[in-house]
């Protein structure tokens, strides 16, 4: 549902931020 989509989006953003930090 919408919660899952939001969670996935946040996960992608988090991974992008972590990748940039590394």
UniProtKB/Swiss-Prot annotation:
The keyword Zinc-finger does not apply. One of its GO terms (cellular component) is extracellular region. Coiled coil: none annotated. The modification Leucine amide is found at residue 22. It is found in: Secreted. Skin. Keywords: Amidation, Amphibian defense peptide, Antibiotic, Antimicrobial, Cytolysis, Fungicide, Hemolysis, Secreted. GO terms for biological process: defense response to fungus; defense response to Gram-negative bacterium; defense response to Gram-positive bacterium; hemolysis in another organism. Belongs to the gastrin/cholecystokinin family. Has very strong antimicrobial activity against Gram-positive bacterium S.aureus, Gram-negative bacterium E.coli and yeast C.albicans. Has strong hemolytic activity against human red blood cells. This is Antimicrobial peptide 5.
